[in-house]
UniProtKB/Swiss-Prot annotation:
Residues 12-110 bind DNA. Gene3D superfamilies: DNA-binding pseudobarrel domain. Its main location: nucleus. GO terms for molecular function: DNA binding. One of its GO terms (cellular component) is nucleus. It comes from Arabidopsis thaliana. It comes from the Eukaryota. PANTHER family: B3 DOMAIN-CONTAINING (PTHR31920), B3 DOMAIN-CONTAINING PROTEIN REM22 (PTHR31920:SF32). Residues 143-199 have a biased composition (Acidic residues). This is B3 domain-containing protein At5g60130. Residues 124-222 are annotated as: Disordered.
Length: 326
């Protein structure tokens, strides 16, 4: 890849032109950029694209053929290429926050226009290739994991999780436009019950429900946080409807997007998902099917949703999902 470094506005940046024939499994940082890396080198870095995708990559120090010290992002560059559907000649800009996060954007080769983040009403831009039926499907801000992530060419250690990545690819590649269309096609003025999308685990008598609620709170990070428990409705598993009673009881408010934290966060990171608020007050988390698929949730499992809010206005920033096998 062609590359360079910019000091505009004192923000460390570097640029690359994506050349498929020269692009390897990992991404080498420009040698001139290494002086901007912190002295205490992080083991992992976050790459966050303007399209909303987030990846966790390992950062390794290696030596080239001429013994020149190099730094390389390993175990994930091929996923970024796939998730962002990079084309030959696309111009990539990486901006470093000085700690452990790289923000990057893409300028398309043909138009030199920057790809921007989609709104909830725009069509999907991110394409992933289906390995099973060779169809292209649009992705919904999901970490689409590449089963071809081989070991590093830089002798920086083996990837012991390659089989896990392959499994995740098969699970997550079909998180597509259907997730959003199901939500958008619900009329705003039609009342929606809590079990229309993900079935609420409310089929219990009240005495037993109180006992179960107390037992389930043991799984929360903070027992005082709002929470609700759901089981999977196999017919409606592509989006999540926040129960109206929870919103009302805790006077919750929602931004345009929230962070989802699931049991696989240490391996694959968090997921950023869009919020759909209808005129009748119904609140959906769009693209929730990715959580169902990558955790292989069964209809016998319980999903305990812990809502983490900030400030006096009870703004929801994060929902943590605890999955109890049934």
């Amino acid at each position: 890849m062609n590359k360079g470094v910019s000091l505009d506005n004192c923000v460390p940046k570097f640029f690359k032109v994506y050349l498929p024939d020269e692009s390897g499994d990992d991404m080498v940082l420009p040698i001139s950029f290494t002086r901007f890396l912190p002295k205490s080198l992080p083991e992992t870095v976050t790459v966050r694209s303007i399209s909303g995708n987030i990846w966790k990559l390992e950062l390794k120090k290696c030596c080239g053929d001429d013994d020149t010290e190099k730094f390389v992002m390993v175990n994930g560059w091929k996923r970024i290429v796939k998730d962002e559907d990079l084309k030959g000649g696309d111009f990539l800009e990486f901006e470093f926050d000085g700690s452990s996060c790289f923000h990057f954007c893409i300028y398309e080769h043909r138009t030199m226009c920057k790809k921007i983040r989609r709104s909830s009403d725009q069509s999907e831009e991110i394409k992933v290739e289906s390995d099973s039926d060779e169809q292209n499907q649009a992705s919904d801000d999901v970490l689409s994991l590449d089963e071809d992530d081989d070991d590093s060419d830089y002798n920086c250690g083996e990837d012991n999780d390659s089989d896990d990545y392959a499994d995740e690819a098969a699970v997550e590649k079909d998180d597509n436009d259907a997730d959003d269309e199901d939500v958008d096609n619900v009329a705003d003025d039609v009342p929606v019950e809590d079990d229309d999308y993900v079935e609420a685990f409310d089929s219990r008598d009240h005495a037993k429900a109180d006992d179960d609620d107390e037992d389930e709170r043991q799984y929360l990070d903070d027992r005082e946080n709002p929470s609700f428990t759901l089981i999977l409705n196999p017919k409606k598993k592509s989006q999540l409807l926040i129960p109206a009673r929870v919103i009302k009881d805790y006077d919750l408010h929602f931004p345009e997007s929230i962070t989802l934290v699931d049991p696989l966060v240490k391996k694959f990171g968090t997921l950023e998902k869009q919020i759909k608020i209808q005129t009748n007050g119904s609140v959906f988390v769009k693209g929730f099917g990715s959580i169902i698929r990558r955790n292989k949730v069964k209809t016998t499992d319980k999903m305990i949703f812990e809502i983490k809010k900030t400030g006096d206005n009870n703004l929801v920033q994060t929902i943590k999902i605890h999955i109890i096998s049934g």
